[in-house]
Amino acid sequence: MILGLGMDVVEVARIERILAGPPARVDRFLERCFTARERAYCDAARDRATRYAARFAAKEAASKALGAPAGIRFTDVEVVRGAGAPVLELAGVAATAAARLGVRRVLVTLTHDGGVAAATVVLDGEEAR
């Protein structure tokens, strides 16, 4: 049963502008929004801004799918590499909200084209009673 659905779109140029900013501001943004694993993955790529944009979109989409729970942090949602497809790992407020909803599986898809990155998140499970 689908318990939640979220979608988000991010302009890659917006992330490029942030990454081109003062180093202290860039570091603050990256540490607030992305886990160490996400930063390592994105920073190793030539298309760094695109990878960050797609992951940012996934975090926003997950928050929407969960009903935008109060206190959720960007780092509560982590995009990790799965076997051929990205996987979302939830922690903190996101994990608590998912458990409360009865979520058993989180599906995510990422895409980018024409300067835009997008993500869709589907929460699957049995409705909590």
Swiss-Prot record:
Its main location: cytoplasm. GO terms for molecular function: holo-[acyl-carrier-protein] synthase activity; magnesium ion binding. One of its GO terms (biological process) is fatty acid biosynthetic process. It is an enzyme of class 2 (transferase). Mg(2+) binds at residues 8, 60. Its EC number is 2.7.8.7. One of its GO terms (cellular component) is cytoplasm. It is found in: Cytoplasm. Belongs to the P-Pant transferase superfamily. AcpS family. This is Holo-[acyl-carrier-protein] synthase. It comes from Anaeromyxobacter sp. (strain Fw109-5).
